[in-house]
Amino acid sequence: MLTIGTALRPNATRVMLLGSGELGKEVAIECQRLGLEVIAVDRYADAPAMHVAHRSHVINMLDGAALKRLVAQEKPHYIVPEIEAIATDMLVELENMGQKVVPCAQATRLTMNREGIRLLAAETLQLPTSSYRFADTESAFRQAVSEIGYPCIVKPVMSSSGKGQSLIRSEPQLQAAWDYAQQGGRAGSGKVIVEGLVHFDFEITLLTISAVDGIHFCAPIGHRQEDGDYRESWQPQAMSDVAVARAKEIASQVVKALGGYGLFGVELFVCGDEVIFSEVSPRPHDTGMVTLISQNMSEFALHVRAFLGLPIGTIRQYGAAASAVILPELTSHNIAYHGLETALVGDTQIRLFGKPDIAGKRRLGVALAVADDTDTAIEIAKRAASAVVVTGK
């Protein structure tokens, strides 16, 4: 039976977030709802989750020794990674010492780079994926492209939000694609994956929860990507019953193989009744922010329930809903938001993340909407997002 202590008291139940962005902020809020003590960690100060945490720390999370010292200092009951750029070998070591890592250290280690999870899915589980090759030198990269053929996609094995990704259609693009991939990796230059282009009708995120009362699924989430980053997401994504069943089967296999309790964002390509595995994150997914308005429990609430060992019960989906990102482009350490009166009309909500600064394009918030159908919800969310004017000095 779970016992939760009182935050800021000797019997507190402590949760340490490794990564304190907008997703971590919502996880922190859900932890606060249950009286958990929240320690937010990131590589920069004043990150969004730090605004709603009891304490915060700024460290290089790729530094295993620094991470180990902080865990020894704070003694968390749960370590909850929000990002991939973490010293996952240290998480494995800490777990072996009795520390609870969410969902488990193996899941964070395998999914921190595309090689580990692709080998698990394609070779161990024998799931359908795109054709692929790995390369750690420029010559090996060129050979991989020749084997895969054009068009193909190159990605650093360790990157997120589209960083370092390129679509290659012909040989003259190879040098620029290789150079960009080397700049975009989370740990600097290194190995890349070259993937054959998959012809699909649409992409989905299937939020899959592994909990004490079994495997649960949210309704499929559709999304639109631009420059490797999501711009809008919607729920539910219409798809055939056969495709839904296949998607659940694939997601269940992946989640069970990774292990542990928590919510997983399983990314899949859908073409008719055919479903192809793409990627998985062992944590809430950015496209899943639509669940802040579309469900009785958001993906963040589900994640917290699951990793605490609590039953999930019933997930209710309220109908057509959408999210659209607020993505301004400017440079400022003193950001201001205007136009909320125009944005907040009808069935809309706004989330502003509270990021401390911006240099270029940065996702600073999200607009949420519900409507009679997903197309209408998307348009309402996009209008609301565009109504928010961001300025800075």
Swiss-Prot record:
Annotated source species: Yersinia enterocolitica serotype O:8 / biotype 1B (strain NCTC 13174 / 8081)
Name the EC number(s): 6.3.1.21
A cellular-component GO term for this protein = cytosol
Q: Which InterPro entries does the entry mention?
A: ATP-grasp (IPR011761), ATP-grasp_carboxylate-amine (IPR003135), ATP_grasp_subdomain_1 (IPR013815), PreATP-grasp_dom_sf (IPR016185), PurT (IPR005862), PurT/PurK_preATP-grasp (IPR054350), PurT_C (IPR048740), Rudment_hybrid_motif (IPR011054)
Q: Which keywords are on file for this protein? A: ATP-binding, Ligase, Magnesium, Metal-binding, Nucleotide-binding, Purine biosynthesis
Under what name is this protein listed? Formate-dependent phosphoribosylglycinamide formyltransferase
Detail which positions bind ATP: 114, 155, 160-165, 195-198, 203
Citing just one GO molecular function, the answer is: ATP binding
Q: Which gene encodes it?
A: purT
| Gene3D superfamilies assigned | 3.40.50.20, ATP-grasp fold, A domain, ATP-grasp fold, B domain
List the Pfam families: ATP-grasp, PurT_C, RS_preATP-grasp-like
UniProt GO BP: 'de novo' IMP biosynthetic process
Q: Which SUPFAM superfamilies match?
A: Glutathione synthetase ATP-binding domain-like, PreATP-grasp domain, Rudiment single hybrid motif
